[in-house]
Amino acid sequence: MNSVLFLTLAVCSSLAYGKEFVATVRQNYKENINQLLEQQIQKELAASYIYQAYASYFQRADVSLPGIKKFFSDASSEERDDAQSLIDYINQRGGHVQYDKIDLKDACETVMKFVTSDTSGLEEFRDRRMCICGFVATKTINDNCGERSDWKEGLIAFEDTLAIERYVNAQLLDIHKKADDEKDAHLTHILEHEFLEEQVSSINKIAHAITRLRSFEQGSGNNYKLGRVYLRPTPQISH
């Protein structure tokens, strides 16, 4: 009994300690801002997880689109780099970082909910089903995907990607607004020049890819053409 109580107190003490700010560094850096940045780290890592899953899907022998696989592998790495940049930034400001689990199904469902919201600006994607994500996840996302031949092509994946990038961008814009409300000039500057600039560029590039794919006739040959062109994600801005 005493050992259990000691362990419980030790865990609670550890959690409390982990949430301490670094007083010698922290200045004009609020708890609510730190919490938002922690949440954004989770969202960046969730996006990375989705992209890694998509990369593995396009590497399958019955899909075999190496160019698109490479696109998603690089996109996954880019999102992880963004998460690391946020971690570095929190530490630079004297903040603290706690981590939560990442569930692929939950991550995909969050994007789906964003797409169907009034603020997404993606009315044409209201029937987004994230079928590839559901195919590679351990838990079923929905039962409305039908035959795999209907959604296994690259166009669907890039439409999913546009939704994900716009979701991440919306979260960054929300953090920027709250940072501005708190008069945190340093954070608003970092968000504008190192994160939002990159997101806008990525969204534009993905939109071009979708337009190009839609202009092709449906078929794996045209997906292969896009794969050979290889639409590389926008290079990471140095943080």
Curated annotation (Swiss-Prot):
GO terms for biological process: intracellular iron ion homeostasis; iron ion transport. Residues 27-217 form the Ferritin-like diiron domain. Keywords: Iron, Iron storage, Metal-binding, Oxidoreductase, Secreted, Signal. Residues 105-146 are annotated as: Insertion. One of its GO terms (cellular component) is cytoplasm. Fe cation 1 binds at residues 44, 79. It comes from the Eukaryota. Transmembrane segments: none annotated. Its EC number is 1.16.3.1. It catalyses: 4 Fe(2+) + O2 + 4 H(+) = 4 Fe(3+) + 2 H2O. Midgut gland and bloodstream. GO terms for molecular function: ferric iron binding; ferrous iron binding; ferroxidase activity. Belongs to the ferritin family. Contains an 'insertion' sequence of 42 residues which is not present in other ferritins. Oligomer of 12 or 24 subunits. The functional molecule is roughly spherical and contains a central cavity into which the polymeric ferric iron core is deposited. Stores iron in a soluble, non-toxic, readily available form. Important for iron homeostasis. Has ferroxidase activity. Iron is taken up in the ferrous form and deposited as ferric hydroxides after oxidation. This is Yolk ferritin. It comes from Lymnaea stagnalis.
